[in-house]
Amino acid sequence: MNLLIMGLPGAGKGTQAAKIVEEFGVAHISTGDMFRAAMANQTEMGRLAKSYIDKGELVPDEVTNGIVKERLAEDDIAEKGFLLDGYPRTIEQAHALDATLEELGLRLDGVINIKVDPSCLIERLSGRIINRKTGETFHKVFNPPVDYKEEDYYQREDDKPETVKRRLDVNIAQGESILEHYRKLGLVTDIEGNQEITEVFADVEKALLELK
């Protein structure tokens, strides 16, 4: 089974990806892991990626696409199938993935989209606070500290509501075009992500069993 998992930051995509891998035994292909492995193994694309990263530059799409292609061509993919997590990030990468799969004789069986209302995600992502003295991380709503005093805690710039909203807006714009592409191919299953983790996975599992 060859799958793609999508979802906005904070939607719980990583948690569900781990559960899918555990339950269905597919190879988990996350962008970060792929880059680290390609650079550690000094593959052609790994060396290219490292040359950009060492200069503090963004890795161009053709290199990212090449690293994905290298990974999808490995033997375990034909045996186990895969779950792509964090790629494609743009519609251009989605088209490149289509071409790669066709070239390798693979096909995408389904796209799992973990849906959570952006306003809920802003609450999830912007609630993180850090204790100035201990460095411990808490959440204003979901994991509040005992005896909370505002002056004892600070919030990272990345976690402030306005920053979180800007980040989500970018992700929504990019994600919608990718989802539309896969919807036209009849591959997308939307999963309600604003429920307990076990309930989300029950819905994911049901959808995947129907694909088998």
UniProtKB/Swiss-Prot annotation:
Keywords: ATP-binding, Cytoplasm, Kinase, Nucleotide biosynthesis, Nucleotide-binding, Transferase
Nucleotide-binding listed as a keyword: yes
Subcellular location: Cytoplasm
Pathway recorded for this protein: Purine metabolism; AMP biosynthesis via salvage pathway; AMP from ADP: step 1/1
Enzyme Commission code(s) on record: 2.7.4.3
Coiled-coil annotated spans: none
Reactions accelerated catalytically: AMP + ATP = 2 ADP
One GO molecular-function entry: adenylate kinase activity
Gene3D superfamilies: P-loop containing nucleotide triphosphate hydrolases
Role, per record: Catalyzes the reversible transfer of the terminal phosphate group between ATP and AMP. Plays an important role in cellular energy homeostasis and in adenine nucleotide metabolism.
Entry text on domains: Consists of three domains, a large central CORE domain and two small peripheral domains, NMPbind and LID, which undergo movements during catalysis. The LID domain closes over the site of phosphoryl transfer upon ATP binding. Assembling and dissambling the active center during each catalytic cycle provides an effective means to prevent ATP hydrolysis.
Protein's name in the database: Adenylate kinase
Organism listed in the record: Streptococcus agalactiae serotype Ia (strain ATCC 27591 / A909 / CDC SS700)
Gene: adk
